[in-house]
């Protein structure tokens, strides 16, 4: 299958297969009905990155992607069917402008798109050369024509001609949340499925109460809707870019019960265990929190051993996983103290092997 294609006629089959794989993989931990959430069959991806291939015969640039599982094979991309409607609208216009301008094309090696459901968009042009004032003048004309935000980047140089972020609005149980999503920050790529993930997490935690600890909070994606269910939320994140966006998003959404600490999960575990003191926690009294629940959305590596031990101290665990294999490993450890009461599958990446899962664990 060519990268970026959307064979919509196969969607139902591949989704059913993912449900069965998930049921089989977690049968030792859960035997109830899986909460399974579909994706749109096409135009679901809100961000995309393309290599730029310069044809030596024609001199023209084209979009390209690596062929999955085939080393050093680059495939030209004519259409990106899984991309949002806004990405597909922008792609030919951006490429035409690049091919009509020596300044824009010279040593251009990558183009990135970040879009929102509103049509807001950031396009980043990335170069193997310094960017001049002449480049900036031409890029400003292109930005005006495209009606989007344009960024130029090269080594140790970034020129943002407007904003370097989009504003996304997601609907969770009839309430809208607005998010700043920065072009270099992590965001969920499938907005439609992201809304379903947020709604599921908020719904299944509605009756818990108490205070919430969140690790790996990113830009506050889950933090904001979950804060509706808890008295107070303490959220941690190590990325400075994400922390800055999270603080912006908390203010824009009028949330008053959320505190953010820039710590890794390992550092926070040390703080909770009183192994180390952190200046980044000097305005936060950990002992004042009455934590009932921990929420984690870790990277593919899952939770490290110490964080698993930390999570096991909470009555309720909400775990969103982008890697079912490491989730299963972590559940094997947590199963001694907790039982899985809900299991969800979110089809973030149709037509791939990728499965996003969610589990609720309650103390035995």
From Swiss-Prot:
A cellular-component GO term for this protein: cytosol
Domain of life: Bacteria
Cited Pfam families: tRNA_U5-meth_tr
Catalyzed reaction equations: uridine(54) in tRNA + S-adenosyl-L-methionine = 5-methyluridine(54) in tRNA + S-adenosyl-L-homocysteine + H(+); uridine(341) in tmRNA + S-adenosyl-L-methionine = 5-methyluridine(341) in tmRNA + S-adenosyl-L-homocysteine + H(+)
Annotated GO MF terms: rRNA binding; tRNA (uracil(54)-C5)-methyltransferase activity, S-adenosyl methionine-dependent; tRNA binding
Active site: 322, 356
Annotated positions binding S-adenosyl-L-methionine: 188, 216, 221, 237, 297
Entry-linked SUPFAM superfamilies: S-adenosyl-L-methionine-dependent methyltransferases
EC number(s) per entry: 2.1.1.-, 2.1.1.35
Keywords, in A-Z order: Methyltransferase, S-adenosyl-L-methionine, Transferase, tRNA processing
InterPro entries in the record: MeTrfase_TrmA_AS, SAM-dependent_MTases_sf, TrmA_MeTrfase, U5_MeTrfase_fam
PROSITE patterns, per the entry: SAM_MT_RNA_M5U, TRMA_1
GO biological process: tRNA methylation
Similarity remark: Belongs to the class I-like SAM-binding methyltransferase superfamily. RNA M5U methyltransferase family. TrmA subfamily.
Function: Dual-specificity methyltransferase that catalyzes the formation of 5-methyluridine at position 54 (m5U54) in all tRNAs, and that of position 341 (m5U341) in tmRNA (transfer-mRNA).
HAMAP family in the cross-refs: RNA_methyltr_TrmA
Protein known as: tRNA/tmRNA (uracil-C(5))-methyltransferase
Protein species of origin: Teredinibacter turnerae (strain ATCC 39867 / T7901)
């Amino acid at each position: 299958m060519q990268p970026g294609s959307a064979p919509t006629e196969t969607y139902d089959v591949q989704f059913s297969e993912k449900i069965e794989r998930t049921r089989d993989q977690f049968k030792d931990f859960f035997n109830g009905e899986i909460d399974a959430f579909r994706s749109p069959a096409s135009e679901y991806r809100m961000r995309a990155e393309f290599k730029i291939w310069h044809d030596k015969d024609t001199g023209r640039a084209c979009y390209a992607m690596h062929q999955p599982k085939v080393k050093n094979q680059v495939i030209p991309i004519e259409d990106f069917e899984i991309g949002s409607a806004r990405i597909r609208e922008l792609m030919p216009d951006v490429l035409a402008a690049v091919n009509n301008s020596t300044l824009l094309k010279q040593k251009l090696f990558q183009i990135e798109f970040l879009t929102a459901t509103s049509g807001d968009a950031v396009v980043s042009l990335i170069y193997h050369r310094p960017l001049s004032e002449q480049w900036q003048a031409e890029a400003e004309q292109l930005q005006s024509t495209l009606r989007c935000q344009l960024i130029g980047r090269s080594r140790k140089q970034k020129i943002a001609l407007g904003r370097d972020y989009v504003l996304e609005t997601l609907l969770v149980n009839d309430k809208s949340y607005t998010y700043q999503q920065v072009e270099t920050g992590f965001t969920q790529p499938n907005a439609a499925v992201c809304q379903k993930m947020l709604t599921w997490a908020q719904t299944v935690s509605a009756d818990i109460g108490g205070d919430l600890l969140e690790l790996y909070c990113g830009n506050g994606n889950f933090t904001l809707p979950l804060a509706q269910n808890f008295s107070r939320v303490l959220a941690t994140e190590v990325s400075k870019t994400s922390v800055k966006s999270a603080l912006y998003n908390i203010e824009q959404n009028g949330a008053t019960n959320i505190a953010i600490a820039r710590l890794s999960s390992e550092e926070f575990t040390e703080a909770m265990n009183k192994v180390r003191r952190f200046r980044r926690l000097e305005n936060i009294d950990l002992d004042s929190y009455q934590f009932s629940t921990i929420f984690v959305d870790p990277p593919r590596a899952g939770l490290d051993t110490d964080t698993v031990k930390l999570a096991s101290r909470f009555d309720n665990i909400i775990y969103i996983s982008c890697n079912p294999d490491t989730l299963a490993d972590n559940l094997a450890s947590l199963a001694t103290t907790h039982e899985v009461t809900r299991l969800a599958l979110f089809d973030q990446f149709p037509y791939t092997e990728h499965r996003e899962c969610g589990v609720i664990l309650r103390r035995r």
